[in-house]
Amino acid sequence: MSEVISIRVRRGLKKELEELGINYAEAVRKFLEELVARERRRRALERARALREELRKKGAFPPSAELIREDRDEASR
């Protein structure tokens, strides 16, 4: 099922789009789909960063220096 979204554009823009053979309906559809995908990724990244920070505060992640020291100690053996 689909929905209808209507927009107003400056005078003459629709005519220019038609003269240039631009399928504006398809272009707007594609833009809106990309906009939704971008926003979903942005929000997922925001949630992941917040979760990582929360876990870091609870001590779930050792400090980077400790991890580097462990790697170097193992490599020198």
UniProtKB/Swiss-Prot annotation:
Transmembrane segments: none
Keyword presence, Coiled coil: yes
Source domain of life: Archaea
InterPro entries: VapB3-like
Coiled coil ranges: 10-60
Coiled coil in keyword set: yes
Record's subunit section: Forms a complex with putative toxin VapC3, possibly VapB(2)-VapC(2).
Purpose of the protein: Antitoxin component of a type II toxin-antitoxin (TA) system.
Protein name, as recorded: Putative antitoxin VapB3
Species of origin: Pyrobaculum aerophilum (strain ATCC 51768 / DSM 7523 / JCM 9630 / CIP 104966 / NBRC 100827 / IM2)
Gene name as annotated: vAPb3
